[in-house]
Amino acid sequence: MFQHTTVLLKEAVDGLNIRPDGIYVDCTLGSGGHSEYLLSRLSEHGKLFAFDQDEAAIMHARERLARYGRQVQFVHRNFRFLQEELSALGVKSVDGVLFDLGVSSPQLDEPERGFSYQHDAPLDMRMNRKQRLTAAEIVNCWPYEELVRIFFRYGEERFSKQVARKIEEVRRTRPIKTTGELVDVIKAAIPAPARRSGGHPAKRIFQALRIAVNDELEAFREALEQAIELLAPGGRVSVITFHSLEDRICKETFKKASESPPLPPGLPVLPDDYRPVLKIITKKPIVPSEEELERNHRARSAKLRIAEKL
């Protein structure tokens, strides 16, 4: 069931400088916490478009947000299709866009989704259960070199080669079908001293697989660039990230859009192409308060960055 504590709720939504009659997008509807608070700040003339690729999330949010009626429109699609979907709905610009890139707790807590190393379940990890690629296919079919690449790039796992080698060894004799079986393989591959420090030994590998299954980083990069393009002047984008890979993409995208490229000498007038597109509002990311961390330990790695369209 969708019971989920929303992270950095007021900071992320208030950071959008809500206009009561504005048009807003929640790219990561999830359990609907950010959307609900955002809708409460809108007048009857305001509008929210809420994206999620998880059908269960949309079904839950329809009930939770039913009182807002036609003020909220749900879009069951990955946020990388942000511009395409809004264009089809006749929306050319928006006043604010919100991203919360954490996997929602219900997805983590439903064993059958296969996201968690805490429960034994089929190796799945699909946000959109209609897509074909699963974690089981990656683990059992992808070559050693590809496994090393995703474990190192997406999980920043220093024992990527050892884990990939152990997976290759085990799958020669039998397929690795469940999260529990994969955890055992990971534990067997990682040296004992490393297993005893730095959190659960499977954490980084599971993160890497989840990102690879859902193509999360590329989808986010594409969606963030589209969001910036869609913003009206004065519109804002709020991004909550939970690990360094996402945060790096956000930070670099904001930085690039807030700087002028090097100018050719002798230009009498600054062309529009050379003007910065964004103003960064958060020089340093906003992090959860001690009080929020006490209420919700899953918020501990959250970072919020906000930028405004010029």
From Swiss-Prot:
Keyword Transmembrane in annotation: no
EC number: 2.1.1.199
Top-level lineage group: Bacteria
Residues that, per the record, bind S-adenosyl-L-methionine: G32, G33, H34, D52, F79, D100, Q107
Chief location bin: cytoplasm
Subcellular location: Cytoplasm
A GO CC term attached to the entry: cytoplasm
InterPro entries in the cross-refs: RsmH (IPR002903), SAM-dep_MeTrfase_MraW_recog (IPR023397), SAM-dependent_MTases_sf (IPR029063)
CDD domains in UniProt: AdoMet_MTases
Catalytic activity annotation: cytidine(1402) in 16S rRNA + S-adenosyl-L-methionine = N(4)-methylcytidine(1402) in 16S rRNA + S-adenosyl-L-homocysteine + H(+)
GO molecular function terms attached to this record: rRNA (cytosine-N4-)-methyltransferase activity
One biological process term in Gene Ontology: rRNA base methylation
HAMAP family: 16SrRNA_methyltr_H
Function of the protein: Specifically methylates the N4 position of cytidine in position 1402 (C1402) of 16S rRNA.
NCBIfam families: 16S rRNA (cytosine(1402)-N(4))-methyltransferase RsmH
Assigned protein family: Belongs to the methyltransferase superfamily. RsmH family.
Name of the protein in its database record: Ribosomal RNA small subunit methyltransferase H
Gene designation: rsmH
